[in-house]
Structures are given as C-alpha cells and as structure tokens.
C-alpha cells in the first residue's frame, strides 16, 4: 500500500502559502490540490484531515512556539514557506500521536530542501524545530503512542550540507 504522507504535507504547505496571499479558508485552499489517489485512500484522508485541523485549530499556539525560538526575527519577516513548514511540523509533533518526532522533523527538512525559500532554509527549519522539540520534550508536551513513541532526540537529524 502506497503512503501519501509526503505528498499530503506538500499539498498542505501549498494551501498554507495560498492563505498567506489571499483571503480564503484553509479547506478550500487545500481541497483543490488533492489528487484522486489521495481522495480515494481513507488513511491518506484521515492524515490530511488531522494535520489540516491541527494547524487550523492551534495556529496561535504553534506561532507562539515559533516566535519564542526565532529571537532575532519578527514572524512577518520569516519566509512564508519556512514559516508554514514549521507550522506543519509542529502540528505533527504536538497532535499526530502516531508519527515519531524524528520523522516529522526529517520530513520538514526534506520539504524545506524542495521548496527552499533560501539556500539555508533546511538548516533554519532544522535548528528551530530541534530547539522547540527539546523544549516540548522537557515540558512533557510530546504525547506519542504506537509507531510515534519517542525513542531518542532528533537533534542530529541533519548536520551535512544540503545536496
């Protein structure tokens, strides 16, 4: 069975980007991006709906974490793509209990490489997510079960130059 999670993450990123540029609701912005394969796969749609709802319902909390860890940046100055990759990854860390933190962070880094707003986007995303993850873990705010159980810190997910 094929998994569509990376594709779903990319579609949600595109929807979040659309929201930054024009007035619309997130469901409309994301819905037209989905492929028939995703629409017909109940597991894919479950993940899509969970991630989309988590971002929508918790955006203020997610943005507070980002703002607290981007000391020298006003939220409005962070590249739209990078900011929305961070939002998506934090929603996964906090609200998708079956996804390991290492996977959420690595997926965010890979998507940052693909949609990079600058040549340092993936490093920026990695650094911010690592700092936030460590804080959330220390505070006991990461709740995982099943495949999502925490087995080690993803602090060393990426230490090499992007390809």
Curated annotation (Swiss-Prot):
CDD domains registered for this protein in UniProt: Terminator_NusB
Keywords: RNA-binding, Transcription, Transcription antitermination, Transcription regulation
GO annotation, biological process: DNA-templated transcription termination; transcription antitermination
GO cellular component, one term: cytosol
Pfam families (UniProt xref): NusB (PF01029)
Statement: the UniProt record of this protein carries the keyword Zinc: no
SUPFAM superfamilies, per the entry: NusB-like (SSF48013)
Gene Ontology molecular-function annotations: RNA binding
Free-text function comment from the UniProt entry: Involved in transcription antitermination. Required for transcription of ribosomal RNA (rRNA) genes. Binds specifically to the boxA antiterminator sequence of the ribosomal RNA (rrn) operons.
Family, similarity comment: Belongs to the NusB family.
Name used for this protein in its record: Transcription antitermination protein NusB
Name of the gene encoding the protein in the UniProt record: nusB
């Amino acid at each position: 069975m094929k998994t569509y999670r990376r594709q779903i993450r990319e579609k949600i990123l595109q929807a979040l980007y659309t929201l930054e540029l024009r007035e619309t609701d997130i469901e409309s912005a994301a819905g037209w991006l989905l492929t028939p394969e995703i629409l017909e796969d109940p597991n894919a749609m479950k993940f899509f709906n969970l991630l989309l709802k988590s971002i929508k319902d918790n955006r203020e909390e997610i943005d507070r974490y980002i703002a607290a860890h981007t000391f020298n940046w006003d939220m409005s100055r962070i590249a739209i793509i990078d900011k929305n990759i961070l939002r998506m990854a934090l929603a996964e860390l906090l609200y998708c209990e079956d996804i390991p933190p290492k996977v959420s962070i690595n997926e965010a880094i890979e998507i940052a490489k693909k949609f990079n707003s600058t040549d340092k986007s993936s490093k920026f995303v990695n650094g911010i997510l690592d700092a936030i993850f460590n804080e959330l873990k220390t505070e006991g705010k990461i709740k995982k079960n099943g495949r999502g159980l925490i087995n080690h810190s993803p602090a060393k997910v990426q230490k090499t130059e992007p390809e």
